[in-house]
Amino acid sequence: MKKTIVIAIAGLSLAIAGCASSPNLDESFSDIGANADLKGVLFADRTHDYGDVDITIFEGRLMLTGTMNTEEGRRKLIENAWKANGVDQVIDEILIADGTSLGQGFEDTRIDTTLRAKLIADGDVKAGSFKTSVSRGVVYIIGVTPSERQLNAALDIARSIGGVEKVVSHMLVRPL
């Protein structure tokens, strides 16, 4: 029981720390709520398989990546995404295809982990100003950066990682 409580507190601490790195704490909590809303709706919907869909939200902009088996499922996913509280924009990067293979899933995880580590280590990039998702070797980046220089630095880092097929940016440049 104590172990469960400690793990829950540690998880909550990490979530709050992640929120604190965002430019706007209220938007971070709103993003967490929107993410939970949408995941709850998708979990309850047994008509489509959403197992290969990644949901990434940043300041009310919800990015959907991954694969769906049917166009009907993709449309339903987008419809549900707009219903989540706090969502101002839905970015559809869903591919209609068979689900990602186990090997490709491991490769995507390796790319994502490498990218996050390199972004955190880079002095020119503020890692808390964006989020990433990787699907089938394609890196998707969403967030806000204060300059084109920081944006280009982040994109160059993503492109430099072995196994990356393409980098898709949904970044906004918003000077301080």
Cite the ranges covered by each PLM segment:
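N-terminal targeting leaders
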Residues: K2-L176
